[in-house]
Amino acid sequence: AHPDCEPGDVFVTNDPYAGGSHLPDITVVTPVHDESAVLRFAVASRGHHADVGGVTPGSMPPFSTRLDEEGVVFEALQLVKAGVFDENRVRKTLDASVYPARNPEENLADLQAQVAANEKGVHLLGRLLERYGLDVVNAYMQHIQDNAAELTAQAIERLADGVHRFEDRLDDGTRVAVEIRVDGDSMEIDFSGTDPAVEGNLNAPRAVTIAAVLYVLRVLVGKPIPLNSGCLRPVRVRIPDDSLLSPARGHAVASGNVETSQRIVDVLLGALGLAAASQGTMNNLTFGNEDFAYYETLAGGAGATATKTGASGVHTHMTNSKCTDPEVLETRFPIRVRRFSLRHGSGGEGALRGGDGLVRELEFLEPMRFSIVSERRTTRPYGMRGGDPGAAGMNLLNGKALEHRVTAEVGPGDVLRVETPGGGGWGTPP
């Protein structure tokens, strides 16, 4: 998008149709030039912003049908030119949407922090180049990818040759299906049986689908190697256009990144017979009003494997976050944490048991709006090799059951309770 970039330039993007995930995940990219101003590398940082606009606080609307309902889109916007941060341009972009960002000051601070993080990366890369030289650094970058490709090929070779199929469904019935063809040290992953893109926001951009595949390959390797595209070299991935896993531009995608990604992992692990399903959702919770916005994901149970019971109360697979401590939550927001505990008995029984989910109970202390985007409320995390499925999750407001995705106004004294799913068990229960 910017082939004429110069030293001191920095760019920002969150476009789900150009390598992004969903709009709150904003990527800042700093080109790295040599002393002759030749572009050699790029350093990037991606951070989840608390709010980038959209129809609900937290930019995770349960019922969005268009991308513009989910917030502001940065399409490779120039953030810094010749070392000068362009605050006015960023402010205009944050305010230009039909549903503008609610706290642009926070966005600006986060973007400046990402620019600073990139600068640290550029500095460290510079030290590496000074010590070893460009040719050696380039060579070892290639070696890292070659090593990843070799280890992935070795891991694939340990799998049984042939065709492995699996499918699962989201709570609305949408099917995610995969066929994996293993041939020696290579494989083809084909999602052709997956349903078309949906009207809602469960569509997963192609980049999210590839990321889920890469994650499973990295798990398959089982060694502490840097995550990189070399893992994909022995693998061919087929994703049908205009499907749930590769929607056309303009489709809403907020839940695809956080929910459908989990189901992609579930079907891949199921096809390969590696693990029972983990909770299969991020249990996305947002709340706020005109003064603040808060977003968190809630942990649940992990699926059991052939050698281990599932862990309880943990974030699994695509989540990559932690639950906020009750003390921090109560100090910063008008919320009282009434309960935060394991959901005992929610893990699926088996020779090896699935992990238990969590119970998170919040009392609201002032008027606000909350939203929940969750899955595994009607479908249950599958067991493997005769193991029982984990318990489905539940969302309740003042004791009344809610749908798996909901947004509502609440007032002082209202209590929200989220019970997260357990993981599936492995093997026939004793």
List where the protein language model places each region.
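Glycine/proline-enriched, intrinsically flexible loops and inter-domain linkers
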Residues: 1-34, 39-188, 192-430
